[in-house]
């Protein structure tokens, strides 16, 4: 009985140490990116050039980091279209790779969404001065769409390069410089 209790306590200590060190892996990599950034770009929709305002906030969480981003476009007819995303990321066993923590898991943690249900599979990586977020969608016909957000550190804030690819075809590219507030 005492032997089993000792093993249980050691296992709990080992699991706790793993989660503490596992969580700490990602924290230093995100520090240079932390902050609030704003900017704008011009996008073309149906042959019309439209201004798009961009807003990004990168913050630390207890488990990793969070990225909130919003784009606001004034359409030619005056309507305002806003899209926003708010995704937390946690470290993985790979030093520079982070999984999205978008849905509660069975054991109280969080997990990515399910791409087989039409939900985006999202992950991030940090390589050098670039934070990249990937969003993979599996389409109804079995094809795919991949959205890539490269956010590279610059003297004034972040350089954003966005790409949207469907079944190997480049559908959209957006570039902008975002200023850190």
Language-model segment annotations:
Residues 2-12:
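Bacterial N-terminal signal peptides that target proteins for export
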Residues 24-38, 60:
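N-terminal helix-cap/turn-to-beta initiation motif at the start of protein domains
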Residues 40-139, 144-146, 169, 179-181:
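Central antiparallel beta-sheet cores of small beta-barrel/beta-sandwich binding domains
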Residues 150-153, 161-170:
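Short, exposed beta-strand-loop hairpins at the edges of beta-sheets
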Residues 160, 173-181:
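Acidic/polar low-complexity flexible segments
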């Amino acid at each position: 009985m005492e032997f089993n209790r000792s093993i249980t306590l050691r296992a709990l200590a080992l699991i706790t140490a793993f989660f503490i060190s596992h969580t700490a892996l990602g924290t230093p990599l995100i520090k240079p990116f932390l902050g609030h950034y704003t900017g704008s770009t011009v996008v073309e929709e149906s042959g019309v050039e439209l201004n798009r305002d961009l807003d990004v906030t990168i913050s630390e969480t207890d488990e990793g980091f969070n990225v909130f981003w919003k784009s606001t476009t004034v359409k030619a007819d005056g309507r305002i279209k806003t899209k926003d995303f708010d995704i937390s990321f946690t470290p993985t066993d790979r030093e520079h790779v982070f999984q999205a923590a978008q849905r509660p898991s069975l054991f109280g943690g969080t997990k990515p969404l399910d791409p087989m249900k039409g939900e985006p599979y999202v992950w991030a990586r940090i390589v050098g001065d670039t934070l990249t977020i990937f969003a993979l969608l599996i389409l109804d016909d079995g094809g795919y769409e991949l959205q890539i957000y490269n956010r590279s550190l610059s003297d004034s804030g972040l350089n954003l390069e966005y790409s949207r690819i469907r079944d190997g075809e480049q559908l959209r590219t957006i570039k902008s410089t975002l200023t850190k507030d």
